[in-house]
């Protein structure tokens, strides 16, 4: 389904509203949701870490888990992600977040153009 007159994609797989941190890629249905994510993910990381630290004092990096949670809160029309150029399910992206908890820092998100099929294949190798 193509983009609507107001610039909304109902099929996230066709969307051109894309952000990436190098490994993970999130797709958005509208420019509004993409900007809402980019404007608020750092604040959400801080709030998420405060909540976790109230429960337990952990040295783990929870940023990616916070970003996935924020993405699912912001994007109301579905959930579509890639990991290193391959489609990733909700469960796979969470497993990735758990694996990255031992890394000292998480990369920041930036807007990218939607990669073409040839670029995806190159990333998969």
From Swiss-Prot:
It comes from the Viruses. Signal peptide: none annotated. Coiled coil: none annotated. One of its GO terms (cellular component) is DNA-directed RNA polymerase complex. Gene3D superfamilies: Phi-29-like late genes activator, P4 (3.30.70.3560). Residues 77-96 bind DNA. Keywords: Activator, DNA-directed RNA polymerase, Early protein, Nucleotidyltransferase, Sigma factor, Transcription, Transcription regulation, Transferase. Disulfide bonds: none annotated. One of its GO terms (molecular function) is sigma factor activity. InterPro entries: Phi-29-like_sf, Phi-29_GP4. This protein is believed to be a positive regulator of late transcription. It may function as a sigma-like component of the host RNA polymerase. Binds to a region of the A3 promoter located between nucleotides -50 and -100 relative to the transcription start site, that presents a sequence-directed curvature. Full induction of this curvature is needed for the transcription activation process. Belongs to the podoviruses GP4 family. This is Late genes activator.
């Amino acid at each position: 389904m193509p983009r609507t007159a107001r610039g909304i994609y109902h099929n996230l797989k066709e969307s051109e509203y894309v952000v990436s941190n190098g490994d993970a890629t999130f797709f958005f249905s509208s420019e509004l949701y993409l900007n809402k994510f980019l404007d608020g993910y750092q604040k959400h990381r801080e709030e998420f870490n405060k909540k976790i630290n109230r429960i337990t004092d952990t040295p783990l990096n929870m940023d990616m888990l916070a970003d996935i949670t924020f993405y699912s809160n912001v994007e109301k029309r579905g959930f579509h992600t890639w990991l290193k150029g391959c489609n990733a399910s909700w469960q796979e992206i969470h497993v990735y977040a758990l694996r990255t908890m031992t890394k000292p820092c998480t990369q920041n998100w930036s807007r990218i153009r939607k990669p073409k099929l040839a670029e995806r294949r190159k990333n998969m190798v």
